Amino acid sequence: MQKKTLSDISCKGKRILMRVDFNVPLDLNGTITNDKRIIEALPSIRQVLETGGRLILMSHLGRPKGKVTPELSLAPVARRLSELLDTDVVMANNCIGTEAMQQALALQDGEVMMLENLRFHPEEEKNDPEFARELASMGEIYVNDAFGTAHRAHASTEGICHYVPISVAGFLIEKELRYLGNALANPERPFLAILGGAKISGKIDVLDNLFDKVDTILIGGAMIFTFFKAQGYQVGTSLVEEDKIELAKHLLEKAAAKNIRMLLPEDVIAASAFSADAETATVPIDSIPETMMGLDIGPKTIDTYSREILKARTIVWNGPMGVFEIDAFATGTIAIAHALADATAKGAISIIGGGDSAAAVMKAGLESGITHISTGGGASLEFLEGKELPGIAALND
């Protein structure tokens, strides 16, 4: 998917309207608790400012449901960005309207302003054409650098592209397309996918799309129990999607028919209850006690999966191996993160599809050992499903 990028345009003297993902966590005092998303947008922001562009930033924050919600103002974000850039950031009171427009027109080369939360207007998520047109009038060139919302057809991601002469991808989206796109279109082999998470229903489309592309799939997370039930095993009180057992059988048959190695765990860490202080035992998957539930992959599985990971040249990971929020059941997920970092050190390309897997890598302190950690959980999942992302499709080719 070749899209025009920030590198293809001249910003000098132009009003550059950039959609960023500044949906950062705030504490009760309105203080930003993690500014990673702001830092990730800095390369694109600096590119515009250093080449003499007049930058107008827009983002959403939280879920104000189309109403002005003072505690979800982007003002704290503008302050933090100002510190990071060591320059003033003009904060608008709205994202459209006469006052915001006058502030945009008053910008000089190398200056930056932040529009107020897009989702204070219900028209944003409805992709309202009039609202999109009004946003578009703020700038002369549109840059989308918000991969996390690229799978949403909103006014600031999709609608706006119909009303600006030039719309291009920022550096963050360019990087996402390069790694995720290449992994799916032209991977170095062996190509291995690791899929975790609680439910098969959330991963059906990913599995379907990956069956045409990968050599090996490793399965973890609670969805393994629906597969085991489909194979006739007793799984104790483990989570099972009863209505997906037939589908699990079908997926196992499909993998076999396509000659794909689809590995399921050999053992699990079982617990008497879903709790940190529950009694636990390591058991083979054919001997899960009927009063216990599996909450993580076991040591034999960790060993097998780690060996598979070290054989691969391209690795995509989406979803944890167990209930990694509870330390007692985080071992499998953290071990997979370490194996991924080891494989990367040996020259493999490792890609993590945002969300919980990314959180696990951060928890293990291994983010610098991974080739690419996607900035969008839902967007990367839809990309892996082979779906077109509206916010990217709308950009200039």
Swiss-Prot record:
Under InterPro entries, the record lists: Phosphoglycerate_kinase, Phosphoglycerate_kinase_N, Phosphoglycerate_kinase_sf
Q: Where does this protein hold substrate? A: D21, F22, N23, R37, H60, L61, G62, R63, R119, R152
Q: Which Pfam families does the record match to this protein?
A: PGK (PF00162)
Q: Does the keyword Cytoplasm apply?
A: yes
Per its record, the protein catalyses: (2R)-3-phosphoglycerate + ATP = (2R)-3-phospho-glyceroyl phosphate + ADP
GO MF annotation list = ADP binding; ATP binding; phosphoglycerate kinase activity
**Binding residues for ATP, per the UniProt record?**
K203, G294, E325, G354, G355, D356, S357
Quick one: which pathway?
A: Carbohydrate degradation; glycolysis; pyruvate from D-glyceraldehyde 3-phosphate: step 2/5
Record keyword Membrane present: no
Q: Where in the cell is it found?
A: Cytoplasm
Xref: SUPFAM superfamilies: Phosphoglycerate kinase
Question: What GO cellular-component annotations does this UniProt entry give?
Answer: cytosol
Q: Which domain of life is it from?
A: Bacteria
Q: Name one GO biological process term.
A: glycolytic process
- According to its UniProt record, the EC number is 2.7.2.3
Keywords, comma-separated and alphabetical: ATP-binding, Cytoplasm, Glycolysis, Kinase, Nucleotide-binding, Transferase
Q: What's the subunit arrangement here?
A: Monomer.
Similarity comment: Belongs to the phosphoglycerate kinase family.
Q: What is this protein called?
A: Phosphoglycerate kinase
* Taxonomic placement: Bacteria, Pseudomonadati, Chlorobiota, Chlorobiia, Chlorobiales
